[in-house]
């Protein structure tokens, strides 16, 4: 009997069958042809997120590439709900987004939904979500986005978004929102209005919007695709990633609410190493003798999966490690030590950049070229109706 899995914007459980998920969500596979076309148009080698199919599904990405080829361009939009510290799983889609911004030379809008997290999380105050907004913004800036082509905006500050959301809210009836978000009679009225605010950035430019995000976030954009053309805009496009697995196994995704499953971006590198050593599940045999005789199972190993997704950029080295494990030449302890070294190097570098990001917050939010344009721009005519 096949194991069941569950993927919603709020829950991810079980071993995910990504091919089945494409069918369930009605998305399209990110094919080799599309990836080859991306490499050709950008004149670049694809990053590991695309080469190794961590991004595996899309909506209208082919049309995004058509628009780019025809000189129409496109823009990027992504975001973060600031409910606590960010971990490695949160930041990976931002690195993919940075590559897209850099190679296609396009604008990027990053929405920080401090209002949403206050409304949806009973245990958080508005002050909490504003605090985490600032902390999360530092991690996002540390990724290395172009400050003149990136606008990071916090919903509680960028109140113009409310003015844009009102005509959008007029396009979404309660049954549409309920079908996506599962609202009930107990749902707060602020929660019911929020989908309109989340859709607003897809109308920041009169071009097609591309959203790189994990597949569980896809339902948020289905609503926009239902009404965008009636406002004279494009249906938003999306690139979907798989989930970054928790330390404890390949089921579900890394969760900030379960500290033993996650490496936070602000973790002390030494403590992060201890956490990996203690909790990271491997695909090894019960004994050293059996490991040498039978070999390991990298397909079931979190350590190998982390290297594959993010921490081993060299394809040749990754495959050498894969076969050394399968042949019993590589022991789990050796692999863990290697991953610990790579994670610690990443954390040290990220935390240095995070410290420097403190001086860049104002530029990304207020004084950068794109930020100023957005603060000064009038509401688009179709959204005034």
Curated annotation (Swiss-Prot):
Enzyme Commission identifier(s) = 6.1.1.2
Q: Which residues cross the membrane?
A: none
Which subcellular locations apply to this protein? Answer: Cytoplasm
Motif mapping: 'KMSKS' region: 253-257
Mind telling me which GO cellular component terms the entry cites? cytoplasm
Q: Name one GO biological process term.
A: tryptophanyl-tRNA aminoacylation
Q: Which InterPro entries match?
A: aa-tRNA-synth_I_CS, aa-tRNA-synth_Ic, Rossmann-like_a/b/a_fold, Trp-tRNA-ligase, Tryptophan-tRNA-ligase_arc
Listed SUPFAM superfamilies: Nucleotidylyl transferase
| CDD domains per the UniProt record, alphabetical | TrpRS_core
One of the entry's Gene Ontology molecular-function terms is: ATP binding
Keyword set, alphabetical order = Aminoacyl-tRNA synthetase, ATP-binding, Cytoplasm, Ligase, Nucleotide-binding, Protein biosynthesis
What catalytic activity does the UniProt entry give for this protein? tRNA(Trp) + L-tryptophan + ATP = L-tryptophyl-tRNA(Trp) + AMP + diphosphate + H(+)
Q: Name one Pfam family in it.
A: tRNA-synt_1b
Q: Where is this motif: 'HIGH' region?
A: 82-90
Q: Which PANTHER family match?
A: TRYPTOPHAN--TRNA LIGASE, CYTOPLASMIC, TRYPTOPHANYL-TRNA SYNTHETASE
Family assignment from sequence similarity: Belongs to the class-I aminoacyl-tRNA synthetase family.
Q: Protein name, please?
A: Tryptophan--tRNA ligase
Q: Give the organism the record lists.
A: Pyrococcus furiosus (strain ATCC 43587 / DSM 3638 / JCM 8422 / Vc1)
């Amino acid at each position: 009997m096949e194991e069941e899995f569950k993927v919603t914007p709020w829950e991810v459980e079980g071993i995910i069958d990504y091919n089945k998920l494409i069918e369930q969500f009605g998305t399209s596979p990110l094919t080799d042809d599309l990836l080859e076309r991306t490499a050709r148009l950008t004149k670049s080698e694809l990053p590991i997120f695309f080469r190794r199919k961590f991004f595996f599904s899309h909506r209208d990405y082919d049309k995004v590439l058509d628009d780019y080829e025809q000189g129409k361009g496109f823009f990027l939009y992504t975001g973060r709900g600031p409910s606590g510290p960010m971990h490695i799983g949160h930041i990976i889609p931002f690195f993919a987004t940075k590559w897209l911004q850099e190679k296609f030379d396009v604008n990027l809008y990053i929405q920080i939904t401090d209002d949403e997290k206050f409304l949806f999380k009973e245990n958080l105050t508005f002050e909490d979500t504003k605090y985490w907004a600032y902390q999360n913004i530092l991690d996002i800036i540390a990724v290395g986005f172009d400050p003149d082509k990136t606008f990071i905006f916090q919903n509680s500050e960028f109140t113009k978004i409310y003015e844009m959301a009102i005509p959008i809210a007029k396009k979404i009836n309660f049954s549409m929102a309920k079908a996506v978000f599962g609202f009930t009679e107990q749902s707060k009225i602020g929660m019911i209005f929020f989908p309109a605010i989340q859709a607003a950035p897809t109308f920041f430019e009169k071009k097609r919007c591309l959203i790189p995000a994990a597949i569980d976030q896809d339902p948020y954009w289905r609503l926009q695709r239902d009404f965008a053309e009636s406002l004279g805009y494009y249906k938003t496009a999306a690139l979907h990633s798989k989930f970054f697995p928790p330390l404890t196994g390949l089921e579900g995704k890394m969760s900030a609410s379960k500290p033993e499953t996650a490496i936070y971006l602000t973790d002390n590198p030494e403590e992060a190493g201890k956490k990996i050593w203690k909790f990271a599940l491997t695909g090894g045999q019960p004994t050293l003798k059996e490991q040498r005789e039978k070999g390991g199972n990298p397909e079931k190993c979190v350590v190998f999966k982390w290297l594959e997704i993010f921490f081993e950029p060299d394809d040749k080295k990754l495959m050498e490690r894969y076969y050394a494990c399968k042949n019993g030449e590589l022991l789990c302890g050796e692999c863990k030590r290697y991953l610990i070294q790579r994670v610690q190097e990443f954390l040290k570098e990220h935390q240095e950049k995070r410290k420097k990001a403190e001086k860049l917050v104002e530029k990304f939010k207020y004084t950068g070229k794109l930020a100023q344009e957005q603060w000064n721009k009038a509401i688009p005519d179709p959204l005034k109706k």
